[in-house]
Amino acid sequence: VNNQLSGRPRNPVGGHVPVAGGLHSVGLTYARDLKAETVQVFVANPRGWATPAGNPKQDEAFRAACEAESIPAYVHAPYLINFGSHTEATVERSVESLRHSLRRGREIGALGVVVHTGSATGGRERSVALKQVREHLLPLLDELTHDDDPYLLLESTAGQGASLCSRTWDFGPYFEALDAHPMLGVCLDTCHIFAAGHDLTGPSGMHQTLDLLVDTVGEGRLKLIHANDSKDVVGAHKDRHENIGVGHIGEDPFRALMTHPATAGVPLIIETPGGKEGHAADVERLKKLRDC
């Protein structure tokens, strides 16, 4: 079925792009080389706590180009952020880091900021960690009062260690802890959800998983998809991305992904191995699965 003929809003396909040297000059040049219809960027070192100011010229050029070409843009917040940490310093740094990503997201015209849902460290109960999530994350969500503020998109993890959110139903308590805030959304990573134990293969694997997600968080909350194949088998709890169709998920579930009602118009971002050539091939592969 050609989705464009069925009147369904098409899924823009793109990738995470490098921006060192210039958000617009480097990031969007790379995106164009991928023939990307959507982009994701870091606005800080993903493995650090630094909160650098933007370059206003690059910000403006990036925002204007994305607007002119109808390219939805997203920010991925740093990996170190964990509101469930038992270390006070980590929680405080997480607040500052995420506040920075949200502010930078607004400055560059991003539609959403993706953050990992974190884990309950120090052997503590999940409920204790979720109380902490509420205490520190809810005020940040309440600060998102401008028309051009990005959504905060929660990305579940592959289920390693004391993960707060890895299966679809784990989003329930997480959303509850945050009063199902209107600025809250979900970023579904296909590799993570597969690694956490949701089998996306077979004729209905992907659709069943998406049904479960919608049952948990409600309609309209799925705002972004990280389209990644998996190097490991289902339920392996390992976060190792693979190129589309090459891993244990395979091509068919990605085709199925783009026919589910919950994903209509939702952008797909690849975070796969292989540098620019591998990325361009993955973008092309997903577009073919979408359009044929």
Task: Say what each PLM segment does.
Residues 31, 76, 94, 105, ...:
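Conserved, mostly hydrophobic/aromatic
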